[in-house]
From Swiss-Prot:
Residues at which Mg(2+) binds: D71, D90
Cofactor: record remark: Binds 1 Mg(2+) ion per subunit.
E.C. number(s) listed in UniProt: 2.5.1.3
Cofactor list: Mg(2+)
One Gene Ontology term, aspect cellular component: cytoplasm
Binding-site residues, 2-[(2R,5Z)-2-carboxy-4-methylthiazol-5(2H)-ylidene]ethyl phosphate: T136, T137, T138, G165, V185, S186
Catalysed transformations (reactions): 2-[(2R,5Z)-2-carboxy-4-methylthiazol-5(2H)-ylidene]ethyl phosphate + 4-amino-2-methyl-5-(diphosphooxymethyl)pyrimidine + 2 H(+) = thiamine phosphate + CO2 + diphosphate; 2-(2-carboxy-4-methylthiazol-5-yl)ethyl phosphate + 4-amino-2-methyl-5-(diphosphooxymethyl)pyrimidine + 2 H(+) = thiamine phosphate + CO2 + diphosphate; 4-methyl-5-(2-phosphooxyethyl)-thiazole + 4-amino-2-methyl-5-(diphosphooxymethyl)pyrimidine + H(+) = thiamine phosphate + diphosphate
NCBIfam families: thiE (TIGR00693)
Protein's name in the database: Thiamine-phosphate synthase
Similarity comment text for this entry: Belongs to the thiamine-phosphate synthase family.
Protein's organism: Xanthomonas axonopodis pv. citri (strain 306)
Pathway(s): Cofactor biosynthesis; thiamine diphosphate biosynthesis; thiamine phosphate from 4-amino-2-methyl-5-diphosphomethylpyrimidine and 4-methyl-5-(2-phosphoethyl)-thiazole: step 1/1
């Protein structure tokens, strides 16, 4: 059976940071308060991605945090990451599962499309991600997901991730609608105090489903 974890909390995604040491310094203080970390760097070449993913894998292992690689199942296998996140043009779940194994965490971007969510769940995805819920500077998109979509996606029986311009104050409503994980990039990394920012996101879960 594919891995469909029972999870909730902050799903942190890394920014496009070219300096590996700085990426580690920015990320390490946050690892004790997040559920998953996704390595995403759209500006890096293959060599830098390998170095950064390997360094983050070691840091995550020290904190017991699963590392998910964005868009690249081969890189996930190479560094021993726990999973991969697949976008619209990043391959299929079956191929990633064959490469990474039944216990791998394989997520799929479903944007504002419940049918894509149904297809992902049927193919064995570990989780589905919907968004953007709000305007975001991290990724240009005109697609907008809604809390109603999260509610509808309960039928999929897989964890639901909400992503896209989400501020801490917006977390309780999304959790109430069914979000298991809140994915965030700039809301944490661009905050004046990233550690406090993570706690702000966590507090949104505590208000709705009991303390994390």
């Amino acid at each position: 059976m594919p891995n469909r974890p029972n999870v909730r909390g902050v799903y942190l995604i890394t920014p496009d940071e070219p300096n590996t040491q700085r990426l580690l310094l920015r990320t390490a203080p946050l690892l004790g308060s997040i559920t998953w970390l996704q390595y995403r760097n759209k500006q890096a070449d293959a060599a830098l991605r390998l170095r950064q993913a390997g360094a983050l894998r070691e840091a995550c292992a020290a904190h017991g945090v699963p590392l998910i690689i964005n868009d690249d199942a081969q890189l996930a296998a190479q560094v021993g990451a726990q999973g991969v996140h697949l976008g619209e043009d990043d391959g299929d779940v079956a191929a990633a599962r064959a490469l990474l194994g039944e216990q791998a965490i394989i997520g799929v971007s479903c944007y504002d499309d419940i049918e894509r969510g149904r297809a992902a769940a049927a193919s064995g995805a570990s989780y589905v991600a919907f968004g953007a819920f709000f305007p975001t500077t991290t990724k240009q998109t005109t697609r907008r997901a809604t809390p109603a979509l999260l509610q509808q996606a309960a039928e999929l029986d897989v964890p639901r991730v909400a992503i896209g311009g989400i501020a801490p104050a917006q977390v309780p409503a999304l959790v109430t609608a069914g979000a298991d994980l809140i994915a965030v990039v700039s809301g944490v990394y661009a905050a004046p105090d990233p550690v406090a920012a993570v706690q702000g996101y966590r507090a949104g879960f505590a208000a709705q489903r009991g303390k994390l």
